[in-house]
């Protein structure tokens, strides 16, 4: 689901709210999460999950096209860990 599809679905569920207000809320939430991660903070939404940073150590990689070794520097990557309630909701037994 894209961001615009999310906003459309929220608008359909909340017809009394203007679409622009929903758009501003979605963008605001995503910006808050991004800004918090940029500052090194962890964001937890109880029952849904938490967003944090994982730090990757420098390592020796390989260029898949040429096979040459490439030094990759250390970096931080965003990480999402699903909460118990979200895990339970999506764990549908066949």
Curated annotation (Swiss-Prot):
GO terms for biological process: DNA recombination; regulation of DNA-templated transcription; regulation of translation. SMART domains: BHL. It holds the Pfam family Bac_DNA_binding. The keyword Endoplasmic reticulum does not apply. InterPro entries: Hist_DNA-bd, Histone-like_DNA-bd_CS, IHF-like_DNA-bd_dom_sf, IHF_beta. GO terms for molecular function: DNA binding; structural constituent of chromatin. This protein is one of the two subunits of integration host factor, a specific DNA-binding protein that functions in genetic recombination as well as in transcriptional and translational control. Belongs to the bacterial histone-like protein family. This is Integration host factor subunit beta. It comes from Haemophilus influenzae (strain ATCC 51907 / DSM 11121 / KW20 / Rd).
């Amino acid at each position: 689901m894209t961001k615009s599809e999310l906003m459309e679905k929220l608008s359909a569920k909340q017809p009394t709210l203007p679409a622009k207000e929903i758009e501003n809320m979605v963008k605001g939430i995503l910006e808050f999460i991004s800004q918090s991660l940029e500052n090194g903070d962890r964001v937890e939404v109880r029952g849904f999950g938490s967003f944090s940073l994982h730090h990757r150590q420098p390592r020796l990689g390989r260029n898949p096209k040429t096979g040459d070794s490439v030094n990759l520097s250390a970096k931080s990557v965003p990480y999402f860990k699903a909460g118990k309630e979200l895990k339970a909701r999506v764990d549908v037994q066949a």
